[in-house]
Structure formats: C-alpha cells, structure tokens
Design a protein with these regions (language model features):
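A glycine-/small-polar-enriched, mobile loop at the entrance of the PLP active site in fold-type I
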Residues: 2-51
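Active-site phosphate-binding strand-loop segment of PLP-dependent enzymes
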Residues: 7, 107, 119-166
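Short, well-ordered alpha-helical microsegments
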Residues: 12, 76-78, 100-101, 150-152
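Conserved N-terminal alpha-helix of the aminotransferase class I/II PLP-enzyme fold
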Residues: 31-79, 97-98, 106
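Short active-site oxyanion
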Residues: 64-66, 89-92, 163-165
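Active-site-proximal loop->helix
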Residues: 83-84, 102-112
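Conserved PLP-anchoring active-site segment centered on the Schiff-base-forming lysine
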Residues: 85-101
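A glycine-rich helix N-cap at a beta->alpha junction
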Residues: 111-119
Length: 166
C-alpha cells in the first residue's frame, strides 16, 4: 500500500526492521539516538550526514544553513512571525483553509495579521483570485499556505508580492 497523504505513511519492512535494530544501540554506541546528547560526536555525525544528504538532494548552496527544528507546524508559524515580523505593524495572510487559519491564529499572538484575502465565507472551496487580494505594501511578509491538505486546495502559481517577502 502507498500512502501519499500529508500525515504518516507506511514504511518498507526493511526500514522498520533497521530502525528497530538500531533503536537501542546506534551503531555500537551503546545508546539510542534519542538518548544522545546533541553535543556528542555520534549525534554530530548523524546531523552532518543528514545535512549533506539534504543539501545534495535539493541542491542547496553553501550560503544557506540547514536547521533541524522540533515543534511541528504551530511552532513554525510562530517562528515565522517572530523572525520576520520585526518592527513592522502587520503581516499579510491569505486564508484558504485549516492550515492557513492555524497560521493566522498563531501569528496573531505575535504580530497584527491582515487577512489580505480568503475563502472562509464559501467553505474554503477555492483560492481567491490574485486581483481580489488586498496586500499591504508595508507588510513584514505575506504568508500563503501553498497546499491546504485538509481541504485539498493547492496553489499552482506563486503571487508576486513585490518587495514584501512571500
């Protein structure tokens, strides 16, 4: 069975067996990865390998850093507002469903949110046409949820927000 949903998916049995076998003793270290101090040589090797692999996979230039962060979507919504909000008065958000609403609610704890466009009144059944958006040219940033997995909406284009970061 193949699962292409946004949540957890099935893994090949070989992967599950390897994970099981290495759960209690990572490569002879005597401990699980979950028990390792993030400052240990073993953990740093794992992180370095993961970073190199990801960098090669997406062809990421060396002038970009890779951060491995915990917290899930809600934490990232807050991190975005905290880091890009700066001294700006507001950020633009386009509300198209479950995840954009969660992003708006989380960012609203940190920065004033301008809902530049949305489709809540029609049950989140479409992405508003760009001509309907009310963008603030002074906004700290503009946030869109490119793939609303809960409602099945997906952008097939990216808006031109001018000098405002998207």
């Amino acid at each position: 069975m193949y699962n292409f949903s946004a949540g957890p998916a099935c893994l090949p049995e070989e992967v599950l067996i390897r994970a099981r076998d290495e759960m209690l003793d990572w490569h002879g270290s005597g401990m699980s990865v979950m028990e390792m101090p993030f400052t240990s040589d073993e953990y740093r090797q794992i992180e370095s390998h993961a970073s190199r692999t990801l960098r090669n996979l997406v062809d990421l230039p060396d002038n970009y850093h890779i951060l491995f962060l915990q917290g899930g979507a809600y934490a990232h919504f807050a991190i975005l507002a905290m880091n890009l909000g700066g001294n700006h008065g507001a950020a633009d958000y386009v509300q198209t469903g479950h995840w954009s609403t969660r992003a708006i609610n989380e960012a609203g704890k940190i920065i004033r949110v301008n809902i530049a466009a949305g489709s809540e009144d029609s049950g989140f059944d479409h992405i508003p046409a760009y001509s309907e958006w009310n963008l603030d040219p002074e906004a700290a940033y503009c946030h869109i949820t490119t793939n609303e997995t809960a409602s099945g909406l997906q952008y097939h284009w990216l808006p031109d927000t001018g000098a405002v970061p998207l």
